[in-house]
């Protein structure tokens, strides 16, 4: 196990040394994400003073109002990842189609990302974050992004909260790095994170319960209440999942009568978070199958999401159809 205090770049290089045939490309790719995260963190911290709060006056491909900080974060991610030359193509939640990199025309990897998850909470200073998912390149077109989640080679998120934390998996466990602004580095603060086998917190927007399409889910939530569970729901997936990862329990965003396929995006949110949770010892499901087994049909596909501790997800599956 890596020692606390190790900086993220050194950690990435140490992991690379465990694989003698590694080219170093994935290491450079992750370092590019780290650089972008530092800049986004700086913008988030100064948002109230730099006129980047509020809406940008546009609607994205998801049909959502684009926040100014959304747009800025997307630009930062695109600039750093394209400039790195380590990605053949990039898919952003904010863009209709993937962006193909001239510098990365021979690159081995593709990346899907949500530049700023939870952006509707920006104006009220709630924790928000960046989510990313990396796959091996398997072709020249859209098929690169239509791979099952279990084929990810790396996934992670950066949460911008009371501190900035970079949570990463490369398929060998999960580690968390806290940003130290005094030295300008992410330092290992949470080595080998394991989600508790069982928690006492559930995270779901019960205000939508009257719209849920599965009565079993209502019974399941009632069962958790009977067992003394606490409800905690922020409305920022990064923040809610981060708490679930550390404390255990269940995070859910089900389908409802308005969003019959769910609301969260498979590529940019569901699959990377499910991969992280699995690497930490947890489970995920759409209610019908493991999220990591879903083969995307579209880069903006949505799915119902339930992720968390094994105990809670196993119990959930006993209730829902």
From Swiss-Prot:
Obligatory cofactor(s): Mg(2+)
Cellular compartment(s): Cytoplasm
Swiss-Prot/TrEMBL GO biological process terms: fructose 1,6-bisphosphate metabolic process; fructose 6-phosphate metabolic process; fructose metabolic process; gluconeogenesis; sucrose biosynthetic process
Keywords associated with the record: Carbohydrate metabolism, Cytoplasm, Hydrolase, Magnesium, Metal-binding
InterPro entries tied to this protein: FBPase_C_dom, FBPase_class-1, FBPase_N, FBPtase, Fructose_bisphosphatase_AS
Cofactor, free-text remark: Binds 2 magnesium ions per subunit.
SUPFAM superfamilies: Carbohydrate phosphatase (SSF56655)
Positions contributing to Mg(2+) 2 binding: 114, 117, 269
Coiled-coil regions listed: none
Residues that coordinate or bind substrate: 117-120, 205, 233, 263
Keyword DNA repair: no
Binding site for Mg(2+) 1: 93, 114, 116
Matching Pfam families: FBPase (PF00316), FBPase_C (PF18913)
Record field: catalytic activity: beta-D-fructose 1,6-bisphosphate + H2O = beta-D-fructose 6-phosphate + phosphate
MF terms (GO), sorted A to Z: fructose 1,6-bisphosphate 1-phosphatase activity; magnesium ion binding
Pathway noted in the entry: Carbohydrate biosynthesis; gluconeogenesis
A single cellular component GO annotation: cytosol
EC number(s) reported in the record: 3.1.3.11
Enzyme class label: hydrolase
Summary of subunit composition and partner proteins: Homotetramer.
Family: Belongs to the FBPase class 1 family.
HAMAP family listed in its UniProt record: FBPase_class1
Protein name: Fructose-1,6-bisphosphatase class 1
Organism encoding this protein: Persephonella marina (strain DSM 14350 / EX-H1)
Gene giving rise to this polypeptide: fbp
């Amino acid at each position: 196990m890596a020692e606390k205090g190790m900086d993220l770049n050194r950690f990435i290089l140490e992991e690379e040394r465990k694989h003698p045939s590694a080219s170093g490309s994935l290491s450079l790719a992750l370092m590019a994400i780290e650089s972008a995260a530092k800049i986004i963190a700086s913008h988030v911290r100064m948002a109230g003073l730099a006129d980047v709060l509020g809406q940008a006056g546009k609607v994205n491909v998801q049909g959502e109002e684009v926040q100014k900080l959304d747009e800025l974060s997307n630009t930062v991610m695109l600039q750093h990842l394209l400039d790195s030359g380590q990605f053949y193509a990039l898919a952003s939640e904010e863009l209709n189609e993937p962006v193909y990199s001239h510098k990365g025309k021979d690159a081995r990897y593709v990346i899907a990302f949500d530049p700023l998850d939870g952006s509707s909470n920006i104006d009220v200073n709630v924790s928000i974050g960046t989510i990313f998912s990396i796959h091996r390149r398997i072709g020249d077109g859209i098929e690169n992004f239509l791979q099952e989640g279990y084929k990810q080679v790396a996934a992670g998120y950066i949460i911008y909260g009371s501190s900035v934390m970079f949570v990463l998996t490369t398929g060998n466990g999960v580690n968390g790095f806290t940003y130290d602004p005094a030295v300008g580095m992410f330092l290992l603060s949470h080595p080998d994170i394991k989600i508790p086998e069982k928690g006492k917190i559930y995270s779901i927007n019960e205000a939508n319960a009257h719209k849920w399409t599965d009565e079993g889910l209502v019974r399941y939530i009632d069962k958790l209440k009977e067992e003394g569970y606490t409800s905690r729901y922020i409305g920022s997936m990064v923040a809610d999942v981060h708490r679930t990862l550390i404390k255990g329990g269940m995070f859910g965003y089900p389908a409802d009568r308005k969003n019959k396929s769910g609301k969260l995006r498979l590529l940019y949110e569901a699959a990377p978070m499910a991969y992280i949770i699995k690497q930490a010892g947890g489970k995920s499901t759409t209610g019908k199958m493991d999220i990591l087994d879903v083969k995307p049909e579209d880069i903006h596909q949505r799915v119902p999401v339930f992720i968390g501790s094994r105990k809670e997800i196993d119990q959930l599956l006993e209730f829902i159809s």
